[in-house]
Regions:
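N-terminal membrane-proximal hinge/A-helix region immediately C-terminal to the signal-anchor transmembrane segment
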Residues: 2-117, 130, 134, 156-161, ...
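Classical protein tyrosine phosphatase
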Residues: 30, 86-96, 103-105, 202-207, ...
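Cytochrome P450 catalytic-domain helical core, especially the substrate-recognition surface
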Residues: 35-64, 83, 110-201, 214-276, ...
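Conserved cytochrome P450 K-helix E-x-x-R motif and the immediately C-terminal K′/meander segment
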Residues: 46-71, 265, 365-408
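Central I-helix of cytochrome P450 enzymes
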Residues: 192, 253, 259-272, 298-358, ...
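Cytochrome P450 heme-thiolate "Cys pocket" and heme-binding signature region
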Residues: 322, 327, 407, 444-479, ...
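Cytochrome P450 heme-binding "Cys pocket" and the immediately downstream C-terminal segment
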Residues: 347-349, 468-516, 528
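Conserved cytochrome P450 K-helix/beta-meander segment immediately N-terminal to the heme-binding cysteine loop
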Residues: 419-447, 536-537
Length: 541
């Protein structure tokens, strides 16, 4: 019997060997990258990142350094058998994540984010599936460009409040004093939060705003620390999620235990509150009440193609409204704060914007959305802020669902694929002199303009952020109003030659913010101060 088994097994082993030999012999090479060590790969650099000053080097900078080292816009990293390919150019992201999006729209299963913290209700982390399609389609219906037009009165009202509160803060200061970072950020947080809470949940009180702002901030912390690929080893070894939190080295379990209740409350508490108001007939019309109305009428059930997913439409609505509040508030705050920080370093650019705004808008009213097409230099500033200092420097991780070949390099099925947004928006092939803040690059005729940063700053392909239209409208109006009414500058005594450092002057995470900074915000004229205090006419809101 043993000899019979041996005689049968030898041919089988030979067949397997020949199959594997032919497959790997003729397979193209993987993209260049750190060789690492046998079995564990590049785990050493993964757990011991370089430092810049007293900060860890962010992933986008490490990926960019690797691209320069290997002279390639595709980088392969192997950590414990987990293959990751990073895309560092416009060309590579356009080809793989846009044109071949059918192969690259999946997500890896992040044990930390989805299983331990509980972000699995967020369609941004869902795998490419019917469930994801249903959630995204539902979200898109509420935040597509045509839908966002209906929210403009809310945006105008909240922008009026932002200007009024800034005017009050400025009026209490001496002529040489500056606005403290925490005061400024509080006003900007209120601005962003009030818009999305009113649109999504019909909430308008300061108490509600403060409550949900704290909750969203802690939830954002969990996402920022956990979603970047490979932050926690449990993502490489999902079985680690079963070890008790008290085990030495299980810091990730203790962090997840802290974050999970907040993430659950983020999606459940506001929805349940609106449900109670809707049932009592006191709810303010909003996206949530629109969906509750559909549910009460028995409409908007899953289409036949989605029935196999057994989707409860209330859970879909609960989840998509939760995503809207969380994502929109953090992104908008980051973009507005970054714009203020950057403009404080560029008085010459502000002067050109002031001249354009005075010519188009005048000094008797605030700019509004109808002015946007007549303010090309302001638009150029807005684009250049997004390009130079992207809110999300590294895109969410995609996952290849089949073997692929690009530029002679092999990309295996199951590989994690990351678009390095910072590298893409500083690609010298697309943006001349990319390390210089220069709005004029977008002032040339359309045929000569570089790609709009909006194509890359909010993700790629079928996974691009569908809430970007509201975020961009909200941010544009805030920046337009600030430039129309104020001079923004660094505090007295600040080093006028100190330039913004893309690493040390920003936080690290999925969404980045400027490090704490103080700024002088001075009304340009007494008339401008009056405009800030009065805001938009009530008939516009």
């Amino acid at each position: 019997m043993p000899s019979t088994l041996l005689s049968l097994s030898i041919p089988a082993l030979l067949i397997i060997y020949v199959f594997l030999y032919r497959r790997f012999k003729h397979r193209p090479p993987l993209p260049p990258g750190p060789k690492g060590l046998p079995i564990i790969g590049d785990v050493i650099s993964a757990i011991s990142p370089k430092t810049v000053g007293d900060m860890d080097q962010p992933d986008w900078a490490r990926y960019l350094d690797l691209g320069k080292k290997y002279n390639s816009d595709l980088i392969h990293i192997n950590v414990l058998g987990d293959h990751t390919i990073v895309l560092n150019s416009v060309k590579a992201t356009d080809e793989l994540l846009e044109r071949r999006s059918a192969l690259y729209s999946d997500r890896p299963r992040f044990a930390m984010v989805n299983d331990l913290i509980g972000w699995d209700w967020n369609f941004g982390t869902m795998p490419y599936s019917n469930e994801w399609r249903l959630h995204r389609r539902t979200f898109h219906q509420d935040f597509q460009p045509s839908a966002v037009l209906a929210y403009r009165p809310v945006v105008l009202r909240s922008t009026s409040v932002l200007l009024e509160r800034l005017a009050a803060t400025i009026s209490d200061l001496s002529p040489t004093a500056h606005v403290e970072h925490n005061d400024l950020k509080y006003h900007v947080h209120n601005h962003a939060g009030s818009i999305i809470l009113r649109i999504v949940y019909g909430m308008t009180t300061q108490e509600e705003l403060d409550d949900y702002a704290k909750m969203a901030a802690l939830a954002a912390e969990s996402m920022n620390e956990s979603l970047n690929h490979g932050t926690f080893f449990v993502d490489y070894f999902p079985i680690l999620k079963y070890i008790p939190a008290w085990v030495p080295g299980a810091t990730f379990k203790r962090k997840a235990k802290t974050w999970a209740p907040t993430v659950a409350n983020l999606v459940n508490r506001p929805w349940e509150k609106v449900k109670r108001s809707f049932a009592s007939g006191t709810a303010i019309p909003c996206i949530a009440t629109k969906h509750l109305e559909k549910l009460s009428n028995g409409g908007d059930q899953p289409q036949s193609g989605d029935q196999d997913q057994h989707e409860d439409m209330e859970e879909v609505y609960r989840s998509t409204t939760g995503v809207a509040y969380f994502a929109a508030s953090d992104t908008t705050v980051s973009l507005v704060m970054t714009a203020i920080f950057v403009l404080s370093h560029h008085p010459e650019i502000q002067a050109k914007a002031h001249k354009e705004l005075d010519s188009v808008v005048g000094n008797s009213r605030l700019p509004d959305f109808s002015d946007r097409s007549d303010l090309p230099y302001l638009e150029a500033i807005f684009k250049e802020v997004q390009r130079m200092y992207p809110v999300s420097p590294v895109g969410n991780t995609h996952r290849a669902t089949a073997d692929d070949v690009y530029e002679g390099y092999f990309i295996p099925n199951g590989t994690s694929v990351i678009g390095n947004i910072w590298a893409v928006l500083h690609d010298p092939e697309a943006y001349r002199d990319p390390l210089k803040f220069n709005p004029d690059r977008f002032m040339v005729k359309d045929s000569e303009q570089p790609p709009s940063p909006e194509l890359y700053a909010f993700g790629f392909g079928r996974r691009i952020c569908p809430g970007k239209h509201l975020a961009l409208e909200t941010t544009w109006l805030a920046i337009a109003c600030l430039l129309a009414t104020c001079d923004i500058s660094r505090p007295h005594g600040a080093d006028s030659k100190k330039e913004i450092h893309p690493i040390t002057d920003f936080t690290i995470g999925l969404t980045v913010h400027p490090q704490p900074f103080n700024v002088r915000i001075i009304p340009r004229t007494p008339t401008a101060l009056k405009l800030m205090k009065n805001g938009y006419p009530s008939e516009d809101m």
